[in-house]
């Protein structure tokens, strides 16, 4: 009789442990109209749902715009650069290349360039070349500080990414890169 009671107690304990490891929250996306009625609802979301192609493409577009834009407002330029580095890990080649680009040649340094000119970036296409590599094309319009068009150029980049599971992110990491999409490497050229 005691062995039966012990067996029942063990099964109950294992059942409790099993239930405690299961997620209690199941995320859903629900759209409501102006009156608060449900207009559309999706099924349960998977953990990887947010890392779809559109989120990756938006991250890549942000990366190019933040890296290539030159604005005379120092505060905005600083924010662009901080957001740019949120998409790279220090150990990746992309960080070293970006450091060289921003700090190497004074003519490429956005703070120095902003003394004479401004650069606006317009993304024209983002195409997946593989699961982790994307080709991005964009137009850059360079203007003088008075606003007259100085030059216009078409650019192309190949960017390699990787995705980190954001479930283990700290609060700061979630604020800076919520999707966990990181730029591993990049190369760009004027065409």
Go through each PLM region and give its residues.
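Structured, amphipathic secondary-structure segments that form assembly/contact surfaces
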Residues: 1-7, 14-29, 33-54, 72-191
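Solvent-exposed, amphipathic alpha-helical segments
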Residues: 59-70
């Amino acid at each position: 009789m005691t062995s039966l009671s012990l067996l029942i107690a063990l099964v109950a304990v294992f059942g409790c442990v099993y239930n405690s490891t299961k997620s209690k929250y199941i995320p859903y996306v629900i759209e409501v109209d102006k009156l608060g009625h449900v207009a559309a609802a999706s099924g349960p979301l998977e953990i990887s749902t947010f890392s779809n192609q559109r989120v990756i493409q938006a991250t890549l577009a942000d990366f190019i715009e933040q890296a290539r834009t030159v604005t005379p407002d120092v505060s905005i330029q600083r924010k662009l650069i901080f957001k740019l580095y949120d998409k790279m890990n220090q150990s990746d080649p992309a960080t070293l290349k970006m450091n060289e680009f921003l700090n190497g040649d004074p003519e490429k340094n956005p703070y120095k360039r902003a003394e004479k000119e401004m650069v606006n970036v317009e993304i024209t296409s983002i195409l997946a070349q593989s699961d982790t590599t994307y080709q991005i094309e964009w137009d850059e319009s360079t203007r003088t500080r008075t606003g007259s068009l100085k030059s216009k150029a078409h650019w192309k980049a190949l960017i390699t990414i990787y995705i980190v599971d954001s479930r283990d992110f700290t609060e700061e990491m979630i604020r800076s890169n919520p999707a966990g999409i990181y730029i591993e490497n990049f190369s760009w050229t004027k065409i």
